[in-house]
């Protein structure tokens, strides 16, 4: 899930730049790839939350993923059949992203209050940072029409990814520590039997 998110966000970062779209042999295709990567990069993020944090009980996450898939499919159909430009439908994707991140953050806050899990806190902070970067970039895009709005969101995504990777690293270290402790206890138990 992390690898898919990293791949899709990386594709979006590269294909969303004006430089990539202007100097490629296929600018329309590059733009289309950018839109689809942006529309779908949240799907692996939601799967990560469900699988890593054991949030399978929250069916709203399945609904969110279905909405992301439906959004990409419907926008593709509208673009192909009715020639509606993707940029004119971008607001729908922004609203879905906003709803998804807020929903996930609220679920995490509730779960953290219940469990006080340190890994959850790191991931919750990552989503919080991405939510702030997302809202800030949306305001810059829709209200202020500031051209570097994408950079703000990209920085937010990079911080988000860094915190997720930190969470994975912390989890691996804790698992290694637990495994080492178990091996020591097993050795002690073996020595006691002798």
Go through the PLM ranges and name each one.
Residues 178-194:
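Amphipathic HAMP/coiled-coil signal-transducing linker helices
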Residues 1-6, 11:
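Juxtamembrane interface at the cytosolic side of transmembrane helices
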């Amino acid at each position: 899930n992390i690898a898919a998110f990293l791949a899709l966000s990386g594709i979006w970062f590269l294909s969303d730049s004006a430089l990539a779209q202007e100097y490629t042999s296929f600018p329309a295709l590059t733009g289309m790839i950018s839109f689809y990567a942006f529309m779908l990069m949240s799907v692996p993020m939601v799967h990560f939350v469900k699988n890593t944090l054991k949030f399978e009980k929250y069916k709203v996450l399945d609904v969110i993923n279905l909405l992301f898939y439906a959004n990409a499919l419907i926008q593709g159909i509208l673009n192909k059949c009715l020639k509606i430009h993707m940029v004119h439908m971008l607001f729908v994707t922004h609203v879905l992203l906003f709803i998804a991140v807020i929903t996930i953050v609220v679920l995490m806050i509730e779960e953290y209050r219940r469990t006080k899990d340190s890994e959850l806190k790191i991931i919750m902070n990552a989503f919080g940072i991405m939510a702030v970067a997302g809202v800030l970039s949306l305001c810059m895009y829709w209200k202020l029409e500031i051209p570097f709005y994408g950079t703000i969101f990209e920085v937010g995504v990079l911080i988000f990814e860094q915190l997720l990777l930190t969470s994975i690293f912390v989890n691996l270290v804790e698992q290694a520590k637990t495994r080492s402790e178990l091996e020591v206890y097993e050795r002690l138990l073996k020595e006691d039997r002798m």
